[in-house]
Amino acid sequence: MIDFNLPEWAKNANIYEVNIRQYTPEGTFNEFRKHLPRLKKMGVDILWFMPIYPISETKKKGSLGSYYAVSDFRNTNPKFGSLSDFKAIIEEAHTLGMKVILDWVPNHTGWDHVWIKNHPDYYTKDAAGNITDPLNEHGQSMGWNDVADLNYDNMNMRDEMVSDMIFWLKEHQIDGFRHDMALLVPLDFWQTIIVKLRAVKHDLFMLAESEIHDHLNQDCFHAIYGWSLHHTLNAIAQGKKKASAIDEWYAYDRPKASKGLFMQFTSNHDENSWSGSEIERMGEAHKAFAVLVNTLDGIPLTYSGQEEPMPKRLEFFEKDDIGFKNYNYADFYTKLNTLKHDNPALWNGNYGGQIKRIMKDDNVFSFIREKDGNKVTVIINLSKQKQTVVSDDDINGTDIFSGKKVSFAKRAECSLAPWEYLVIK
């Protein structure tokens, strides 16, 4: 069985998250567009654009505001450029063979959104009849006071929300959505809209910021976040857990989703800005974990700047240029993306091979993935000490990074330097 309507074009795809504001000194669509050939050469498949919409001025945070305080779902932030500028990105990306998904914000809007004035019933209100910002399960503010919480008991609001999504599918031919805070929106909304959206574009891709397994099990999304595993990886990098903790995720968490994909990552816009870059959180281990998330059975994500690399936290409400210069990790990511494209063992979900653990060890995470005669062996020392493991079968092939032949006979010792990795094809 193939994952819930996973588009064939996504079977061996990766995702690259684009932060337009910080991508170039100018922070515009037109300047980002110049990077498209470079990203194509790096093997990027899906461009996920953080919100590109106008940002509300009312209750704005910082000098530029949050990308997620949207004032108009059918327009673009004038600081980024015009709708036609963005459409030019979509068209060139498609010409290059890449797909485009938009970051959608279904849980709330900015306070300048036209619905605030024309349809106040579209929003959650307190006992005094005032529109509220998003509240937690205890009725307390979540601290997002720059946005107004939408009321999903209002069916007209739901209809308009879907209509705005369809606008982007029909008028601008985007390829899908990443839904912000999808876990805060009722499940039945997703069950309803997936049918409506697929009636417009049958092969769209849907990603949820969520770890609710029913978002996959109930055929609402193709992929959700692998947050639990990500936090485990951070803990391993910091010496708080051992590599064997990954087995626990596969044993107890992964099986709760009977279908679909987990998006795996070492960074994203939230993690970078609020918890630190992958270099800050993972130190010398950051490349080892990048190898891991790009070879596991989820769909991998790379965040803007990781190919530089970028050690700093990007400001969220202010201008803070990534500062691209040398793209020192571009070849590293190109090798990983190329292997995923070319070797069906690493394809996504049921298109690819399952994880088969080998050489089980507390500190070295090793596995094989096989599909239709194709095989990839991954061996990673996830510790800051030298480790030696014993091969439980013959291993022969070529390491994709060094280009050197690798051969271990059954019961042979394999020694690895701290955070060393081998990806053998």
List each language-model region with its residue ranges.
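Short, solvent-exposed turn/loop segments enriched in Gly/Ser/Thr/Pro and often Arg
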Residues: 48-61, 103-112, 180-186, 209-214, ...
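Substrate-binding/active-site clefts of carbohydrate-active enzymes
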Residues: 2-14, 21-27, 37-45, 51-172, ...
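Aromatic/hydrophobic pocket-lining residues that form the small-molecule binding cavity
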Residues: 32, 86, 158-161, 190, ...
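Conserved short secondary-structure transition element at the edge of the structured enzyme core
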Residues: 290-308
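Active-site-proximal helices and loops of the catalytic beta/alpha 8
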Residues: 180-262, 292, 309-339, 344, ...
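Carbohydrate-interacting/catalytic domains
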Residues: 1-48, 54, 87, 92, ...
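Active-site clefts of carbohydrate-active enzymes
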Residues: 257-280
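Hydrophobic faces of well-ordered beta-strands that scaffold small-molecule active sites
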Residues: 14-16, 47-49, 100-102, 177, ...
